[in-house]
Structure formats: structure tokens, C-alpha cells
Amino acid sequence: MLPTTFWAEMSWRDFAAADMSKVVAVLPVAAIEQHGPHLPVGVDMFINEGYLARAVGRIPDDMPVLILPVQAIGKSNEHAEYPGTLTFSIETVTRAWTEIGDSVAHTGCRKLIFMNSHGGNVPVIDAVVRELRVRHRMLAVHAAWQRLGYPADMFSAVERAHGIHAGDVETSLMLAFRPDTVRMSEAQNFVSSAIAVEKEFRHLRVTQPIGFGWMSSDLNELGAAGDAANATADKGEACADHGADAFLDLLRDVLAFDLARLKPGPLARARSPK
């Protein structure tokens, strides 16, 4: 049994004594970027921390999980034209997160979940998890709180599709996690231009499945997209509970995954000692 759930609280003797091959490491990755006029730039960090705080209390003592320090700054160049946004280049953050994965692998841990709270990090994580598989035959998982879903019928289909930034979902979560930072007097329905694009064009979309490179101002000049005025703390609390429970299910999946499923190809087999 591990003495803690947090990587940073372990001593080197704790790591030496632990069977790290049985541990699942979790790397929370976030962003510091503008979130419209009604929310702080730390939204993605606060949401990741809030979900994790909700989940940690539900992790059984005998579940070998270690949560690494939150990586607060990510790839946010799509928001760089708004004051307060901090961003790494895609090259810098890819290298940094890959090297964190290298360090995790060097402890003997070969299961790592990237727990993301910012859409702009997606291409980075896709590249990093593949690289860690190549380097370490590691189960490197690309996960996100958003991908774990929300309670049924809580948000409209339009909001789920287009309320992607500082809309109903994120504002509700912030009302649950950090209400002291939310300015509901400045919240509104920040209508995304993606809705008009979807109606006007046959295949072209702003994001997916066939999208283009966009800046936040392309969606809405105020830097938000979605109906923030409809947000409530009750919805945020329900989302937090849903996400925490789903995260535990994900941990169980990753713990149960047999690394023997990750097969070496013929060149790797040829390099292996006989």
C-alpha cells in the first residue's frame, strides 16, 4: 500500500519500497488562458484541481494511484491575442510532458494517464502518449474530464456541441469549485460562430470532424463560446460527482489492463536479447 496518493509527497525511499509496476500515475494537464469577461484565466487549472479533489476522497486505500503535480500551463496559442494568457510552444510542451513521462517510466511505472482539462492540449497529448509507447512500451492514456461526460440531459445538444469555452459547462463547474472568481453579472450567451458555419456549409466546420485552425476570437470576440448565463452551481456539483465517479472507473480499467497486450513488432523482437 502506498503511503499517499500524491507523487510529490513520496520520499525516494517510498518509491524504492513500492512496486511501481503496479502503480497508475496520473498527470493532470491544464492551461492558463482567457475565459471570457466573467471567468479567471485559471479556469482549466481550477477545474482539473476541483475534479481531482472530488475524486481523491473516493479512491480506495488499496488502489495504487499516484497523482503528479498539475501542469498548469499548456498549449494555448489560440487564446494568445487576449491579455493574461500564458502558453508554451507546441514543441516546448511536447518535450516537457514527454520527459515527465520518461521520468515516470524510470521509476518502473508503466501506466500513465494524462488527465486533461483544456482542448488546446489535445494534439500535444496525442503525440506524447504515442512517443511514450514507442520509448517505453508504456500504457500512456489520453483522457479528459470532458470525455468522461456529464449527467444525462443536463446540457442542450447545442451547448454540448458549441459551448466549448467558458459556456454553461465550465461556468457551472467554476460556480461549484471556485465561486469567488466568477462574475455572473458579466456572463451571457456567448453565441459561437461555429453554429452559423455548421448551417452554411455542407462539410466544413470550425472544429470537427472537418475543421480549420481557429483563434478564440473567430468564435466570439469576447473570448467565450456557450451560454454562460444559464450556469448554476448545482449543475457544477452534479458534473463534479459524475466526473469523479467516471474517473474511478477509468482507474480500474487502467489497473486491469494487461501490459502484455502491448506487443513488440518484428524489429523490436530482433533487438531484444535472446
For each of these PLM feature ranges, what is it?
Residues M1-K111, G119-K274:
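Extended, histidine- and acidic-residue-enriched regions that form the cofactor-binding/catalytic faces
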Residues F114:
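Conserved SAM-binding loop
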